[in-house]
């Protein structure tokens, strides 16, 4: 099916791609259908128009159709306007320093951003259709005061008032990592219109000390612990390469520490080979040494019984063609031989066109609740084959 279906690129004298030709075939005995993606560049070589095969065919037939995406840029290369057949148009107004000042879109949404002398955003105003303009966000930056310098806040965001509340960042690390965060939520469900001063913003928040999270990092940047707003603390241990080795949890008010995951091993390229969960479940993985593709994924219970043992097969371009679960037996039900194998077939554009596999004889589909079942293990022999086809 994939014979004589190359991908061809057409390059103009400036070295810019102007067309990409793909050949579509769904069945082996079908003739190939040429699909052309069209691109247009301006005088200086910037992409300004794009057409997919559908709109390119209409254009070639003489029908006046707009491109899928038309973009306009300034002399300095900044994005000014885009017009999409799907998302509509969007207009941007940048400042002389490259900062975004205002933007409009086809839905009637207007967004305006104010900046400080260092071109950092300090306030974001939003206006939709006939609604009055409101301040949706305000950002406060650390100064060069002794207190900000003591907590490494100079030049960092120390308070961010957003549509859901306020995020306080009282302390940073030497390399810029957040060491503490306090989140205050709005006292009302209505979208906020943040005042200028902090004294006027604080009454809009829920009373109390807020939700505080704290992090600790090693000198090389790895996270050592995290304490959440409920007082639960997670501890992280790393190996010599700085990769995560285990995670432990200490619940609030308890002195005992429980293991969530441990004994994490990696390949030379950083892929996880195995890990041991806190309940004794072990996850084992293997990869192709030539390209790093996942070859198998297994879950082993504490009694060394495999609950899942998946193996994967791929086509030459990396699409999954089959998944086999060796932990499940071959079943026979309703005059069918049901093997624990899922297979996938693709067209010449590598779009999924057929999928086969196995499922429960009474699958629970739709939003309604599943049927009532008597207490006890389900009947594992009531499986049947299924097949799905896809058209684009």
Model-derived features: where do they sit?
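Beta-strand elements of repeat-based all-beta scaffolds
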Residues: 1-392
């Amino acid at each position: 099916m994939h014979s004589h279906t190359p991908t061809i690129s057409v390059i103009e004298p400036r070295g810019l791609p102007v067309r990409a030709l793909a050949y579509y075939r769904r069945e082996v005995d079908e003739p190939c259908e040429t699909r052309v993606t069209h691109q247009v560049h301006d005088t200086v070589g910037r992409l300004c128009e794009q057409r997919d095969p559908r709109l390119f065919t209409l254009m070639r037939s003489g029908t006046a159709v707009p491109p899928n995406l038309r973009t306009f840029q300034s002399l300095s290369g900044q994005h000014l306007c885009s017009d999409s057949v799907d998302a509509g148009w969007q207009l941007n107004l940048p400042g002389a320093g490259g900062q975004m000042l205002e933007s409009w879109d086809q839905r009637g949404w207007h967004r305006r951003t104010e900046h400080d002398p260092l071109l950092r955003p300090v306030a974001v105003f939003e206006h939709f259709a006939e609604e009055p303009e409101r301040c949706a966000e305000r950002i406060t930056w650390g100064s060069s005061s002794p207190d900000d310098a003591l907590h490494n806040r100079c030049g960092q965001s120390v308070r961010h008032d957003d549509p859901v509340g306020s995020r306080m960042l009282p302390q940073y690390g030497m390399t810029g990592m957040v060491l503490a965060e306090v989140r205050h939520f709005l006292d009302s469900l209505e979208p906020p219109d943040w005042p200028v001063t902090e004294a006027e913003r604080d009454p809009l928040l829920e009373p109390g000390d807020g939700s505080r999270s704290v992090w600790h990092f090693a000198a090389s940047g790895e996270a050592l612990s995290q304490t959440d707003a409920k007082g639960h603390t997670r501890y992280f241990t790393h190996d010599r390469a700085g990769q995560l080795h285990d995670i432990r949890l200490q619940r609030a008010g308890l002195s005992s520490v429980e293991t969530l995951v441990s004994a994490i091993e990696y390949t030379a390229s950083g892929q996880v080979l195995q890990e041991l969960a806190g309940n004794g479940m072990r996850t084992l993985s293997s990869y192709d040494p030539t390209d790093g593709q996942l070859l198998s994924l297994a879950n082993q219970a504490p009694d060394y019984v495999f609950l899942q043992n998946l193996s994967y097969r791929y086509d030459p371009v990396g699409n999954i063609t089959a998944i086999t679960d060796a932990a499940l037996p071959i079943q026979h039900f309703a005059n069918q031989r049901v093997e624990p194998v899922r297979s996938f077939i693709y067209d010449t554009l590598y779009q999924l066109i057929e999928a086969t596999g196995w499922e429960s004889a009474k699958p629970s589909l739709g939003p309604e609740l599943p049927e009532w079942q008597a207490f006890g293990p389900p009947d594992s022999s009531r499986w049947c084959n299924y097949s799905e086809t896809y058209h684009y």
